[in-house]
Amino acid sequence: MDRRWKVMTDQTASSELRVAIAGLGSIGTKIAAALDQGEGLTLSAVAVRDPAKHQAFLNGLRRPPQVLPIDQLGEAADIVVECAPSSQLRAIVEPAVKRGKAAVVVSVGGLLDNFDLVDLARANGGRIIVPTGALIGLDAVNAAVIGTIHSVKMVTRKPIDGLKGAPFIVHNNIDIDTLREPLKLFEGTAREAAKGFPANLNVAVALSLAGVGPDRTSVQIWADPTVTRNVHRIEVEADSARFSMSIENIPSENPKTGLITALSVIALLRKQRATLCVGT
């Protein structure tokens, strides 16, 4: 790396920031491997449902972390990263913020049903951090909401495999396996989308929390057999600017999640120790 640019990610050397991870799926393992490289951060602990399943991976790290119950991660870390199913969000985040620690929430859709955790964090000096994830332009939305945002619209197209098992599809008995052309599955608010597609629409909830809220953010979801990537297009009308964003995310090993999600969390964690921070 050119030394002129390395300053942008240089970490302070005073003390390492301890990070714990709840869940070692496709996102959690990538974050764990990156933390094992150091750079002012250390992987201090993990929580997994089946420790034996992940033992080989953990033993292969330079500094294998402790394996702890999820409610004890906050004792061993400064930041707890939630990389588990959204049903586990409260069990992971609540003990951490009660201890005044920071919690990075990947399953941000689950935060809408547990929003009292924000008040709990405030009362105890903790923090809840939502990473940018798959949503480019989140800085622009954060800035625009300081003024007035008139409307936020998002259209998501996903490959068939990335939508299988979504509650909305199951409850409405929609057959997507035989699709030959795009099908609009859903149109409504970000809050409704999060309930119907909890593993697919974290990006919509993050967009809504950065902007006008989950009840004023409009979302369309398409099952599209013609695409191989998760495609998001966002349009924002504000008094400060009118802008649109489009991104095609390469799926990770979990087809419901884009590869960039893990990279976004890694960037966020490194930013906590960076001497020079770029972005809002």
Curated annotation (Swiss-Prot):
Keywords: NAD, NADP, Oxidoreductase, Pyridine nucleotide biosynthesis. NCBIfam families: PRK13302.1 (NF009825), PRK13303.1-3 (NF009828). One of its GO terms (molecular function) is aspartate dehydrogenase activity. This is L-aspartate dehydrogenase. PANTHER family: ASPARTATE DEHYDROGENASE DOMAIN-CONTAINING PROTEIN, L-ASPARTATE DEHYDROGENASE-RELATED. Pfam families: Asp_DH_C, NAD_binding_3. Gene3D superfamilies: Dihydrodipicolinate Reductase, domain 2 (3.30.360.10), NAD(P)-binding Rossmann-like Domain (3.40.50.720). Its EC number is 1.4.1.21. HAMAP family: NadX. It comes from the Bacteria. It catalyses: L-aspartate + NADP(+) + H2O = oxaloacetate + NH4(+) + NADPH + H(+); L-aspartate + NAD(+) + H2O = oxaloacetate + NH4(+) + NADH + H(+). The active site is at 232. InterPro entries: Asp/hSer_DH_NAD-bd (IPR005106), Asp_DH (IPR002811), Asp_DH_prok (IPR020626), L-Asp_DH (IPR011182), NAD(P)-bd_dom_sf (IPR036291). Pathway: Cofactor biosynthesis; NAD(+) biosynthesis; iminoaspartate from L-aspartate (dehydrogenase route): step 1/1. The iminoaspartate product is unstable in aqueous solution and can decompose to oxaloacetate and ammonia. One of its GO terms (biological process) is NAD biosynthetic process. NAD(+) binds at residues 134, 202. The lineage of its organism: Bacteria, Pseudomonadati, Pseudomonadota, Alphaproteobacteria, Hyphomicrobiales. Belongs to the L-aspartate dehydrogenase family. Specifically catalyzes the NAD or NADP-dependent dehydrogenation of L-aspartate to iminoaspartate.
